[in-house]
């Protein structure tokens, strides 16, 4: 964006939410690089020491925490190669779980990102090798559920 000063005042969220307004030569770079920065910032911001209970706000939409964990794990394991599984708020205001490849970000599709689960190999390979499933199971124990709940609820506040 060095040579596109008209976008210098745009936030990363705005850039990703309005990719269609960015000319083709820049769009792919913004999607890939911006998507990666956004996803990883959120991923690390939503981690905490083990021990927190699942966010009560999630339980308003899922019968049990177990169902939410299952949906996220299924999406993460179903992502071939690199990418993220996401808890999102869909454009109609309902929560959903989705998987997106590479650096693709829910903002580009009109969804509000709540919680990313990074399934790029760099997220788990040193400790878990090819055991993505074990990484996912343990990941659920280091989520800052209070922050996730705040993100989820902030979507619905004016």
Which sequence ranges carry the predicted segments?
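Feature for soluble, non-membrane regions of globular proteins
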Residues: 1-158
């Amino acid at each position: 964006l060095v040579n596109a000063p008209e976008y210098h005042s745009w936030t990363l969220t705005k850039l990703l939410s309005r990719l269609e307004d960015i000319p083709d030569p820049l769009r792919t770079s913004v999607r890939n690089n911006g998507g990666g920065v956004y996803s990883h910032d959120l991923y690390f911001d939503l981690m905490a020491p083990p021990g927190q209970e699942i966010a009560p706000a999630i339980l308003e939409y899922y019968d049990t925490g177990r169902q939410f964990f299952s949906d996220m794990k299924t999406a993460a394991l179903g992502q071939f190669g690199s990418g993220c599984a996401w808890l999102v708020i869909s454009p109609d205001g309902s929560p959903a779980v989705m998987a997106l490849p590479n650096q693709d970000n829910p903002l580009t599709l009109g969804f509000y990102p709540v919680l990313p689960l990074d399934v790029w190999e760099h997220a788990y390979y040193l400790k878990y090798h090819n055991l993505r499933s074990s990484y996912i199971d343990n990941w659920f124990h280091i989520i800052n559920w209070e922050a996730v709940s705040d993100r989820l609820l902030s979507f619905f506040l004016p």
